[in-house]
Amino acid sequence: MKYTELKDKSIKELEELLHAKKAELFELRVKLKAMQLSNPNEIKKARRNIARIKTAINAHYSSSVE
């Protein structure tokens, strides 16, 4: 997921996507603790995607204020 894909979406779409990615991160962490996660690097990727989504949301809010 790239930032350029996210900046064209609406705030509502971004918030829904953020909620889904947080749930995905939770599931990955549960799998990690249960020793069922084959690639622990997926947690890092999920965290980075969440950060990208939050950045896009903040950019939308700051552009609407100006």
Curated annotation (Swiss-Prot):
UniProt xrefs under InterPro entries: Ribosomal_protein_uL29, Ribosomal_uL29, Ribosomal_uL29_CS, Ribosomal_uL29_sf
Identify the GO cellular component terms for this protein: cytosolic large ribosomal subunit
Q: Which residues form a coiled coil?
A: none
Q: Does the keyword rRNA processing apply?
A: no
One Pfam match, by short name?
Answer: Ribosomal_L29
Enumerate the Gene Ontology biological process terms.
translation
Keywords, alphabetical: Ribonucleoprotein, Ribosomal protein
A GO MF label = structural constituent of ribosome
- What family is reported? Belongs to the universal ribosomal protein uL29 family.
Task: Tell me the NCBIfam families matching this sequence.
Answer: L29
Q: Which PANTHER family match?
A: 60S RIBOSOMAL PROTEIN L35/50S RIBOSOMAL PROTEIN L29, LARGE RIBOSOMAL SUBUNIT PROTEIN UL29C
What name does this protein carry? Large ribosomal subunit protein uL29
Q: Which organism is it from?
A: Helicobacter pylori (strain P12)
Give the source lineage, highest ranks first. Answer: Bacteria, Pseudomonadati, Campylobacterota, Epsilonproteobacteria, Campylobacterales
